[in-house]
Amino acid sequence: MRFCLILITALLLAGCSHHKAPPPNARLSDSITVIAGLNDQLQSWHGTPYRYGGMTRRGVDCSGFVVVTMRDRFDLQLPRETKQQASIGTQIDKDELLPGDLVFFKTGSGQNGLHVGIYDTNNQFIHASTSKGVMRSSLDNVYWQKNFWQARRI
């Protein structure tokens, strides 16, 4: 009986402490609008080659693509580097992702081993891939599953 009481108390306390993701920035609060903006951005930039330090259609890196997308589509100013982007907003669980959230990956070592994209919908994200340029990828892909680091809501 005592064990049951302790177990019930522990379960109630655990339920009260559940982390709830914060609401998105007001400019990202309408998922339909965000998805449309991300689709338009992908259509405009699809296939743009990867270029470290780039922020134009002649070449763009992952954090540059995030900066340009958030600025041009949602009027949001983000830091330029992936490491800085990984510290803004609030960290959220992967199962709480909403369109417009940032997804981060550890694809190598050191500061240059980080990668960032923007969550779209249906477990997909848009990003500037080093091998294929700007594209849409699935978080279900084994590579991205293995290297997933964190998600952040801005």
Curated annotation (Swiss-Prot):
Leader sequence residues: 1-15
Query: Which leading EC class covers this enzyme?
Result: hydrolase
Q: Tell me the Gene Ontology biological-process terms attached to this UniProt entry.
A: peptidoglycan turnover; proteolysis
Q: Does the keyword Protease apply?
A: yes
Bilayer disposition of the protein? Lipid-anchor
Locate the lipid attachment (N-palmitoyl cysteine). Answer: 16
**Domain named NlpC/P60: which ranges?**
32-154
Where is this protein localized, as stated in its record?
Cell membrane
PROSITE patterns xrefs: NLPC_P60, PROKAR_LIPOPROTEIN
Q: Which Pfam families match?
A: NLPC_P60
MF annotations from Gene Ontology: cysteine-type peptidase activity; endopeptidase activity
Task: Identify the domain of life.
Answer: Bacteria
Annotated SUPFAM superfamilies: Cysteine proteinases
Q: Which residues form a coiled coil?
A: none
| GO CC annotation, single | plasma membrane
Q: Where is the lipid attached (S-diacylglycerol cysteine)?
A: 16
The text of the family note is: Belongs to the peptidase C40 family.
The molecule here is called Probable endopeptidase NlpC
